[in-house]
Each structure stands twice: as C-alpha cells, then as structure tokens.
A protein has these predicted regions:
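An amphipathic alpha-helix signature
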Residues: 67-75, 92-95
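Soluble non-cytosolic domains of exported or imported proteins
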Residues: 26, 64, 85-89
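Periplasmic/extracellular electron-transfer cofactor-ligation site
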Residues: 22-52, 77-79, 100-103
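Gly/Gly-Pro-rich "capping" loops immediately C-terminal to redox-active cysteine motifs
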Residues: 29, 44-71
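C-terminal capping alpha-helices of c-type cytochrome domains
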Residues: 85-103
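Sec-dependent signal peptide recognition
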Residues: 2-10
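Sec/Tat signal peptide C-region and signal peptidase I cleavage site
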Residues: 15-21
Length: 103
C-alpha cells in the first residue's frame, strides 16, 4: 500500500469521528428545542422548564464543562432523563449547541 493510499484511508476513517466531535450547533439547537425543552431551559427565549433541572446555560458555564464529555453523557444519560437514543452525531450537535451558551 502506498503512503498516499494509506493517508487517504486514514483520512476517510477519521473524518466521521472528527465531524462528530465538533458538532453542528444550529442542528443542536433544533434538537434541544424538540427533545430537551420540556425539562431544561435550552434558550434565553424559553420561559419555563422543570424544577430542579439545570438550564443549558448553567451546564455550559460550569467550571469543568467539557463538550466531548457532554456528548458522551448524552449517549448514556442518567436514569431521570429519557433515553432519546441519539446518534453520535446528534449528541455532538447538542453538545456543540450547549457550548455556544458559555458566557
């Protein structure tokens, strides 16, 4: 296998992982408003959320916020959260959106 072929193969295999890691914040906002807004306040224009549930802004502004960690968490959420069965890409998109709420 030539170096060029090997390089092309490595790029092809890692591109989806890199895309998932960065996420699409605009799509993440759409997902947040659809899946998460019943409990979490996901945007500044939202007035109501469930009691004792952090807002997305509060999550984004935690001292140790980690976009990749949030994306992993969404793949296997805690028992109080519904299992939305998000794809890796959708989890990355939601995490990217939450990242935009940092102040």
């Amino acid at each position: 296998m030539t170096k060029l072929t090997l390089s092309a193969l490595l790029i092809a295999l890692t591109a989806p992982a890199l895309a998932a890691a960065s996420g699409d914040a605009d799509h993440g906002e759409v997902l947040a408003r659809h899946w998460c807004a019943a409990c979490h306040i996901v945007a500044e224009d939202q007035e109501h959320g469930a009691d004792n549930v952090p807002t997305f802004s509060a999550i984004a502004n935690k001292q140790h916020f980690d976009q990749a960690g949030i994306a992993r968490f969404l793949q296997d959420p805690h028992p109080k959260m519904p299992d939305m069965q998000l794809s890796t890409y959708e989890s990355a998109d939601l995490a990217a959106y939450i990242e935009t709420l940092k102040k």
